[in-house]
Amino acid sequence: PRIVGETGGKDFVVAHPDCDRQGLLVALLRGAFEYQGQKCSAASRAYVPSSVWDAIRDDLVSEISKIKMGDASDFTNFMTAVIDQRAFDKISGYIDRAKSRDTCKVICGGGYDDSTGWFIEPTIIETSNPTSESMVEEIFGPVLTVYVYDDSDFDQVLTMCDEGSPYALTGSIFSSSEENIQKAYNALRF
C-alpha cells in the first residue's frame, strides 16, 4: 500500500526590505484569510521589515476590514464560518491568549461569535517575540501573526524562520533581488 500524508503546517512569509509591497499585501491578505485560514498552505506567520510594515500596515488593515463574512452559499462572501465548535474554541483561545500577552497586539479583528455558526474575524497579531505561541504553533484559522524586524536583520530572520516552528510545509519569500531569494532558499529549504 501507498500512503500520502498531509501533515501540519505553520506556513511563513518572509519579506525583504526591497520587496514589492503591493504584492506582499495581497499575498498576506489572500494567503492568510482565504478559506478562513483553514487550508494547509495558509500564510499564518510573517516576518516583515519595519520599513515595509510601516508602509503596508494601515492599507492591509483597511483591506481586511472590507472582507465580507457570512453564509457559504452566498458567493459574495470572502469568508465563512470555521469548520466546527472545536476549531472555533481552539482559534478563539489563541486570540484570547495573544490579547493577554505584553509581546502581542491584535491590530485588527480579534472578534468571534458562535451564536449562529462559528465565525471568527480575520485577525492580525503583531508580535515583538518571534517565538510567541501564535508564531510557532499551528492555529489553522483566520489568524496571521506578524513579527516586525529591523531592516538590517534579514539574515537573522531567515534563521529565526527556519528554527521557529517544527512544521515545514510551505513558505513564501518576497524580494526583488535574486541574490536575496537564493539566500532565503538556501536557508529555508527542508
Indicate where each model-derived feature is located:
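Short, solvent-exposed loop/beta-turn-alpha elements that line the ligand-binding surface or hinge
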Residues: 135
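Glycine-rich nucleotide-phosphate-binding loops and adjacent flexible coil segments
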Residues: 142
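Short, surface-exposed loop/turn microsegments at beta-strand edges and helix-strand junctions
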Residues: 138-139
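ALDH superfamily catalytic-core signature
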Residues: 1-130, 151-163, 179, 187-188
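Short active-site oxyanion
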Residues: 168-171
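Active-site donor-binding acidic/aromatic loop of nucleotide-activated sugar
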Residues: 145-147
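Cofactor-binding loop segments of dinucleotide-utilizing enzymes, especially the Rossmann-like FAD-
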Residues: 176
